């Protein structure tokens, strides 16, 4: 067996391990969320299936797998099927350039940051396709909300990272992590971090920015007509998006795998888990604002913060160069 074939098989195996880990983390987060919400709300939560309810996730997956794969007769069948597939795969593909350790990662692209923004932006097509193809007024309204919110906050998501690019001079995520060996980016880029955090919550449609899926207003929004595994793909895709945003926060602002004593991957996993729990805490503690308030907050607060952050970072870098 040639060396090139061995290298190819190793890369494929590495990609499969990352894929299984990401999907597993996203699925397991749904169980952790239910347990934590129950703890904070002084109730039991899932505790019937397996010890401490640990098999509840497997029971939910089996239930979704055997539910009827129903497609409304008035729906656009092809687009209706395509939407959850895009929603599930977009965030997974974005993980290809996230470095987990100094030597472990699927791909090492010099334009890794641009790749993530481009691939993650494909998720908005899944929302539009789901709302349009369902031929349901609530689904369409939810998809229009989601597309407007996602497209707006993706602007702030990208601009909030430009300070890091100016500071490090690279779009490569591995270079950005290595540049944080002495000082994490969250200190000089605190404005960028705050904006990225808000934008990440909005792009993943998580509470309190879950207006596209507001049950009280839109009856679950753009996936109201979905059931079974198609709904499951949307469901798991949302949690994978949370894992992606959490890992990006760690990679870009909190030093990635850097940390004392423990192995690099353990540090990366612990930091990512902390922000995943933070996402759950937001759901448990904050009310849902109106949709116009969400959009106004983005354009009137997040956009000025990103521009000020870029100006300050550019001025500091220019002064240091001179």
From Swiss-Prot:
GO BP terms: aerobic respiration
TM annotation in the entry: 12-32, 79-99, 111-131, 151-171, 183-203, 234-254, 262-282, 301-321
Superkingdom of the source species: Bacteria
GO cellular component, one term: plasma membrane
InterPro entries: NADH_UbQ_OxRdtase_su1/FPO, NADH_UbQ_OxRdtase_su1_CS
Main enzyme class: translocase
First-listed, main subcellular location of the protein, grouped into a coarse class: membrane
Keywords of this entry: Cell inner membrane, Cell membrane, Membrane, NAD, Quinone, Translocase, Transmembrane, Transmembrane helix, Ubiquinone
EC numbers for this chain: 7.1.1.-
Catalytic activity: a quinone + NADH + 5 H(+)(in) = a quinol + NAD(+) + 4 H(+)(out)
Role, per record: NDH-1 shuttles electrons from NADH, via FMN and iron-sulfur (Fe-S) centers, to quinones in the respiratory chain. The immediate electron acceptor for the enzyme in this species is believed to be ubiquinone. Couples the redox reaction to proton translocation (for every two electrons transferred, four hydrogen ions are translocated across the cytoplasmic membrane), and thus conserves the redox energy in a proton gradient. This subunit may bind ubiquinone.
NCBIfam families, per the entry: PRK06076.1-1, PRK06076.1-2
Subunit structure: NDH-1 is composed of 14 different subunits. Subunits NuoA, H, J, K, L, M, N constitute the membrane sector of the complex.
Name of the featured protein: NADH-quinone oxidoreductase subunit H
Source organism of this protein record: Aeromonas salmonicida (strain A449)
Gene name in the database record: nuoH
